[in-house]
């Protein structure tokens, strides 16, 4: 197919007549627009080389990029590949191209388009008004000469955006790669005629880029000289915002003279610098003209304050090759070296402060070696249709290719481990199928014309379909379950409405017909938010749904310099001449400063008090040493850049080993604990070993986990419904079958989670607990129905800000908020809590109408909490230079006490020198504390605490009365059995049950008591406590006396409401469901019947609606179709008994630790005081209320003294956990560590540290310096950073069928890194739960979509909620990245426009043993 219409106006018929009408939609003939080679930046290796071309390439190094519509972006692209039909050498020298170097050669029957990658694309001759379409490159080339294109043409609307003179000129050509534009205008430079010329000069046989025009008619113009030595060259650019740039050009003679003058002034002998250059190179004809510098000469927003230096400057070799690049500060940032024999052939390059990478070529000009002195080197061997790549670790990869020139594709890849993957392509090089190493094939169906994917079929036959409008914009996506995503656009192609699969509608409004920036958005709640923009497309103000405004200031380079929020809250940023962030100042003037090395790595963070956090880097910018407060951590890497050893502050080591595919295969911890991992051909984890504990992982055909076996016995089992949605997880815990069951509505939203526990022998149901969720008409999850409680309804305003809470029909809590939507007043009956904030936004006070509970907070310049004052006492806190809590000074009327906290360098608790001056302990190298002032400790080989015994001081006569605590664990390192003995007699024994997710669902406790014979022994019958959960939050505790249920503040682990119901009252509430009642009496003979599950689900929904007095129209229609009424069904329902309940409000501190329980009458029914680590100091409990919640996420176990903390058990006496972190080093280097500043940080999951209940990430101390102490890998682009993050987590996301998300951060040197991913839900994640560390800037976000096993088409595209996140001005991110189940890597900008879409991410289930 030629990419031309089947019948073209101007073509001749068989009988000689010309065609006057043609079809613009049907294309015929041989392919047109085929490139001479594959894209240089496509398949790359190392630093980088394109092995398909055998070329050294440097894709897209950007020197200038100011914000604005149609901005002038000066980027350099290098390729050593030489096309047979090159365009002339551009102003960056041989081998280099920039966007302005696009050129069209006009030959007799051929058009040759030279792109900015150094390639040639071949098109057939075009008649006026005709177009050619390259299906392999997705590129249109159109010749002017008509006022309109055919109405059915995809470019018809974009064509009309052009000025009429351009459309009508048959001598101009235009190119675009999208129906949304922009157009690249290909014209000629008007030459000034000579004095003796009478007739106009003939047009040249080529066209050059003269400008761009977008679909709004905005233009970017390249000004070319009409005469003189630079005739035809670009000497100026006017961008779409009317900024003017001057391009300073030089000739070879001028550069030679400048070199001679510099030598003379420097007193040196001039080097050989010829006045002329050869007129031809392997990269095309060369006129010797080079770009010397680019100046900004006019800026409409800053007309009086133009830069005093060029934005970029270039230096040249005597042979006219690009030698150096200087940034706008005048500092050299790049250098290049070229072959002595072949002009323009790059043999080395370096970034300033980085090692030099060198290259060797064969006689055909192909790269054969890539030499890296501080990392991996590569060799390349070329054979016909085969390229072998071998790195310096002797790992070999073989690429098998098919096709020629621009259609060459890798069809088979042999990996270093011997596995093979294969790909299939259509005739124009578009991917049709991929087969993984296990032989499973995923098929892709591209549209025959556009190449857009219309269908994806996975190996198990599941398919997703995508639909587009005539402008190639996605209009709907439909999956096997029939749910649909829909998008609508206006006539300019701007998104105006999106309907998500769950029915959630978002609308976008525009007030400027010449802009794609929305002026307002409306969400499903009807809330409207407005935005104003600068002429450069920068956000100036954002007005939320309440009319509150946030304003933004920027500098001319697009960097944000200030943010002004309501309530007087502002932040100011300062940058150096390189654009690196050097200072951040808050409203109160507290300033944090930043320092960098020559390579731009952040080397120091100076806090407002002058303390420094320092980081040292290796040659490639990887952190090798971090120092804070005299404590140092170090990291070592191998040649492949993989971490191979960590050295803690104590000098201990953790080591890592990898396989040939860079997968972790062994980890040996600081304490010697060794874990090993084995993978199958597709990379899935199939076996893990943990000090002899062997686990096997089993998967189904869709790569979903089906079960695990541990020590040969079945552990967890996963079950899925026909849609692939997870419905059940079960396992055996202490002989009991424990399961979790999930229910969803017709839109795939979670509506119920039920835990069940069955008897080991009889399988009788011992316990079940269900939490249900409901959604309002706008799709907000605003209702939760706890087990055996009325519905909890969250009252919101605007886009979901919390305004109140109801239990059933009873309003319980009301909130008042300030102009930042922060809580300022909370009301619960007579109880009122008033909250105030400092000018910097920190908590300043919490005052109650009960003065004794008032609290005032004081912070130091570093943002550390240093004092909490109340009417009863004042506590002052001191910290080390590493941010660790070192002491507490408590003063009151009759009290003045100082309590010190001492730790070794790694954060392990030590005896305090003041209290124990004779102690010689200085550190615990393996982080296993063996003794303290009170106990001796023993651990097993997994690092689990197994025994704790009373310490008998030296000199004390032993009486064998010491108490011994013993701890026993299951294969998942969960505590399942605890005993405490004295005189070798048991005092207490307890056993614990867990569900498959690791949540504790029951405990049984036997206590020592006197039996009928008078002997003391453990009770025969245990005290049994059952637990119920809603996600990761413990909501129900029930024993034989009462049930206590907790309602938490939304999105946190801070308890809000406590509901207690006597067990006897609960028994009266037992009733049949409507479905059960109908089934038991539904037979014709009066006997029972069994309803199908779908009918049971519909009846359950109807019953919940009747009980809530909110019967939906859908349910009424369904009943009517059955000849029934709501009243009839209501008469079939068992009566509802409302039990007597005690309701209290939790009054908590700033962390979420309960301080008091307030009755509905406003009285304090219980109150307590704790130390900083959660130890109970005092308690007033006149009503004998059971209040077991401690620090957020923790439950006190009276029998052991430990706090259950979701994934682990916390020992408050030591301020640490008794087992190692299940997520390994992701939770911090000390695997036992709780946060070392418990005044500000919490850890509600027993995993990684949280700064507070809302953020969910550790940002203090060294963690704040590097985010993750292994030292986050840093990149030069957001794109590369996001790809790295998603490449690491996409497999695990597929395994768990959960979304993961995090942020992309920009450090002060302008480099990027990702924060650690946090787990979301099956259909939702929130990247801001993993915030950027202090001193860095969030610029983007990334997330995954889990597994596509449930057939949801939108797993492959951005959802409406995704787009809300990126478009929200509150979030202030530039883009949002997505890793899909099929391995697609996608991105949209903050206007919802797709900016990246390519394959390459893992698309099979692989998990890390620690996870």
Curated annotation (Swiss-Prot):
UniProt remark on domains: Each rhs appears to consist of a highly conserved 141 kDa amino fragment followed by a highly divergent C-terminus.
Region feature (28 X approximate tandem repeats): 330-1186
Entries under Pfam families matching the protein: DUF4329, DUF6531, RHS, RHS_repeat
Repeat positions for Sequence: 330-352, 353-374, 375-417, 418-438, 439-460, 461-481, 482-502, 503-525, 526-546, 547-567, 568-588, 589-609, 610-629, 630-650, 651-671, 672-691, 692-711, 712-734, 735-758, 808-828, 829-850, 851-871, 872-894, 895-930, 931-959, 960-984, 985-1019, 1162-1186
Keyword Repeat among record annotations: yes
Domain of life assignment: Bacteria
Family (UniProt): Belongs to the RHS family.
Protein name: Protein RhsB
Primary role: Rhs elements have a nonessential function. They may play an important role in the natural ecology of the cell.
PANTHER family found in the cross-reference section: PROTEIN RHSA-RELATED, PTHR32305
The entry's keywords: Repeat
């Amino acid at each position: 197919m030629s990419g031309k219409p089947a019948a073209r106006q101007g073509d001749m018929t068989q009988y000689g007549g010309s065609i006057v009408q043609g079809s613009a939609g049907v294309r015929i003939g041989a392919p047109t627009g085929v490139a001479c080679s594959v894209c240089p930046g496509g398949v790359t290796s190392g630093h980088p080389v394109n092995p398909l071309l055998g070329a050294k390439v440097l894709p897209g190094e950007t020197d200038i990029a100011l914000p604005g519509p149609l901005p002038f972006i000066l980027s350099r692209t290098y390729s050593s590949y030489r096309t047979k039909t090159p365009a002339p050498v551009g102003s960056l020298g041989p081998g280099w191209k920039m966007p302005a170097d696009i050129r069209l050669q006009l030959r007799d029957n051929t058009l040759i388009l030279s792109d900015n990658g150094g390639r040639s694309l071949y098109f057939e001759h075009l008649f006026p008004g005709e177009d050619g379409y390259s299906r392999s490159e997705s590129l249109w080339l159109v010749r002017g000469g008509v006022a309109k294109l055919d109405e059915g043409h995809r470019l018809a609307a974009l064509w009309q955006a052009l000025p009429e003179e351009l459309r009508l000129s048959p001598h101009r050509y235009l190119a675009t790669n999208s129906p949304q534009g922009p157009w690249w205008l290909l014209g000629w430079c008007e030459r000034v005629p000579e004095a003796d010329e009478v007739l106009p000069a003939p047009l040249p046989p080529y066209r050059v880029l003269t400008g761009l025009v977008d679909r709004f008619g905005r233009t970017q113009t390249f000004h070319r000289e009409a005469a003189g030595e630079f005739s035809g060259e670009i000497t100026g650019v006017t961008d779409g915002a009317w900024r003017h740039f001057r391009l300073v050009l030089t000739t070879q003679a001028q550069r030679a003279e400048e070199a001679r003058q510099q030598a003379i002034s420097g007193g040196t002998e001039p080097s050989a610098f010829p006045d002329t250059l050869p007129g031809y190179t392997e990269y095309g004809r060369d006129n010797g003209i080079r770009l010397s510098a680019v100046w900004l000469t006019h800026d409409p927003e800053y007309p009086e304050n133009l830069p005093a230096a060029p934005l970029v400057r270039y230096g040249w070799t005597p042979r006219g090759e690009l030698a150096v690049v200087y940034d706008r500060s005048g500092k050299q940032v790049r250098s290049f070296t070229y072959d002595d024999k072949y002009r323009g052939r790059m043999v080395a390059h370096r970034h300033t402060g980085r090692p030099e990478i060198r290259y060797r070529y064969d006689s055909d000009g192909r790269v054969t070696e890539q030499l890296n002195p501080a990392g991996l080197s590569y060799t390349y061997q070329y054979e016909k249709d085969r390229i072998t790549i071998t790195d310096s670790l002797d790992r070999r990869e073989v690429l098998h290719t098919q096709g020629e020139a621009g259609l060459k594709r890798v069809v088979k890849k042999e990996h270093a481990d011997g596995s093979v993957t294969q790909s299939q392509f259509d005739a124009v090089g578009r991917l049709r199928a991929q087969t993984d190493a296990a032989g499973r094939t995923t098929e892709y169906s591209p549209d025959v014309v556009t190449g857009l994917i219309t269908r994806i079929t996975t190996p198990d036959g599941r398919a997703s379909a995508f639909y587009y409008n005539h402008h190639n914009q996605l209009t709907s996506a439909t999956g096997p379950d029939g749910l649909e995503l829909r998008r609508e656009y206006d006539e300019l192609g701007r998104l105006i409405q999106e309907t998500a699969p769950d029915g959630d509608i978002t609308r976008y409004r525009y007030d400027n017909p010449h802009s794609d920036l929305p002026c307002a958005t409306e969400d499903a709640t009807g809330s409207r938010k407005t935005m104003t923009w600068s002429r450069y497309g920068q956000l100036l103000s954002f007005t939320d749904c309440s009319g509150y405004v946030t304003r933004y200031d920027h500098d001319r380079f697009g960097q944000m310099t200030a943010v002004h929020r309501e309530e007087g809250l502002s932040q100011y940023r300062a940058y150096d001449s390189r654009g690196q962030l050097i200072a951040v100042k808050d409203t109160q003037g507290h300033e944090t400063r930043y320092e960098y090395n020559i390579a731009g790595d952040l080397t120091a963070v100076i806090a407002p008090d002058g303390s420094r956090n320092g980081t040292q880097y290796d040659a490639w910018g990887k952190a090798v040493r971090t120092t804070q407060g005299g404590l140092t951590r170090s990291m070592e890497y191998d040649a492949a850049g993989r971490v191979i050893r960590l050295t803690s502050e104590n000098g201990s080591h953790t080591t890592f080993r990898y396989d040939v595919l860079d997968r972790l295969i062994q980890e040996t911890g600081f304490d010697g604990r060794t874990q090993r991992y084995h993978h199958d051909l597709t990379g899935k984890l199939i076996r893990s070993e943990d000090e002899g504990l062997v686990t096997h992982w089993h998967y189904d055909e869709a790569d979903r986990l089906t079960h695990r076996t541990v020590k040969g016995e079945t552990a967890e089992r996963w079950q899925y419904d026909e849609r692939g949605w997870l419905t059940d997880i079960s396992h055996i815990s202490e002989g009991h079958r424990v399961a979790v069951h999930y229910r969803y509505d017709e839109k795939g939203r979670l509506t119920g989670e039920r835990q069940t526990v069955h008897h080991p022998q009889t399988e009788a149901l011992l316990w079940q607990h269900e939490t249900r969720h409901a959604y309002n008409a706008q799709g907000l999850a605003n209702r939760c129905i706890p087990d055996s409680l009325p519905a909890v309804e969250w009252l919101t305003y605007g886009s979901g800000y919390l305004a109140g809470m109801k239990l059933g029909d009873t309003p319980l809590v009301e909130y008042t908020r300030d102009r930042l939507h922060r809580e300022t007043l909370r009301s619960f009956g007579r109880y009122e809590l008033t909250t105030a904030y400092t000018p910097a936004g920190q908590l300043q006070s919490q005052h109650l109408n009960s003065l004794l509970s008032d609290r005032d907070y004081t912070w130091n310049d570093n943002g550390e909490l240093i004092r909490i004052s109340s009417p009863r006492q004042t506590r002052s806190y001191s910290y080390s230079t590493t941010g660790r809590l070192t002491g507490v000074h408590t003063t009151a009327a009759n009290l003045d006490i100082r309590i010190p906290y001492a730790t070794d360098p790694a954060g392990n608790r030590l005896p305090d020198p003041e209290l124990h001056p004779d102690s010689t302990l200085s550190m615990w190298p393996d982080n296993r504390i063996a003794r303290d002032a009170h106990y001796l400790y023993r651990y097993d080989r997994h690092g689990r605490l197994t025994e704790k015994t009373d310490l008998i001081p030296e000199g004390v006569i032993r009486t064998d009365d010491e108490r011994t605590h013993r701890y026993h664990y299951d294969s998942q390192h969960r505590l399942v059995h605890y005993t405490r003995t004295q005189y070798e007699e048991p005092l207490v024994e307890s056993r614990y049950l867990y569900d498959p997710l690791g949540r504790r669902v029951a405990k049984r406790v036997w206590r020592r008591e006197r039996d009928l014979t008078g002997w003391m022994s453990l009770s025969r019958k245990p005290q049994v406590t059952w637990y119920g959960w809603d996600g990761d939050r413990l909501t129900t505790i029930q024993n034989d006396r009462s049930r206590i249920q907790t309602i938490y503040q939304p999105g946190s682990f801070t308890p809000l409401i406590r509901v207690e119901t006597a067990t006897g009252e609960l028994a009266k509430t037992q009733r049949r469901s409507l479905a059960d009642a109908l089934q038991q009496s539904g037979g014709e003979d009066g006997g029972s019947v069994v309803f199908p599950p779908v009918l049971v689900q519909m009846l359950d929904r109807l019953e919940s609606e009747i009980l809530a007095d909110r019967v939906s129209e859908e349910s009424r229609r369904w009943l009517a179709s059955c000849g029934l009424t709501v009243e009839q069904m209501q008469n079939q329902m068992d009566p509802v008994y409302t039990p007597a309940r005690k309701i209290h409000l939790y009054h908590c501190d700033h962390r979420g630790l309960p301080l008091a329980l307030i009755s509905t009458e406003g009285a304090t029914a219980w109150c307590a005081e704790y130390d900083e680590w959660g130890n109970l100091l005092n308690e007033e409990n006149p009503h004998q209320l059971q209040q077991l919640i401690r620090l957020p996420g923790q439950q006190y176990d009276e029998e052991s003294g430990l706090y259950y903390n979701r994934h682990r058990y916390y020992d408050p006496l030591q301020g640490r956990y008794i087992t190692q972190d299940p997520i390994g080093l992701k939770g911090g280097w000390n695997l036992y560590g709780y946060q070392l500043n418990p005044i500000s940080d919490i850890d509600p999951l027993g995993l990684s540290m949280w700064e507070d209940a809302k953020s969910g990430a550790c940002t203090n101390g060294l963690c704040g310096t590097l985010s993750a102490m292994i030292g986050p890998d840093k990149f030069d682009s957001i794109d590369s950073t996001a790809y790295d993050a998603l490449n690491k987590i996409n497999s695990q996301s597929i395994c768990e069928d959960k979304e993961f998300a995090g942020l992309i951060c920009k450090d002060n040197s302008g480099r990027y890194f990702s924060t650690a991913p946090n787990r979301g839900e099956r259909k939702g994640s929130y990247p801001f739960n993993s915030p950027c560390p202090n001193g860095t800037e969030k610029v983007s976000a990334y997330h995954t979509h889990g597994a596509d096993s449930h057939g949801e088409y939108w797993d492959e595209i951005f959802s409406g909620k995704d787009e809300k996140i990126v478009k929200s001005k509150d979030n202030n991110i530039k883009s949002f990245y997505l890793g899909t189940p099929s391995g697609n890597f996608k991105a949209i900008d903050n206007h919802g426009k797709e900016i990246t879409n390519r394959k390459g991410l893992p698309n099979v289930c692989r998990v890390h043993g620690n996870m």
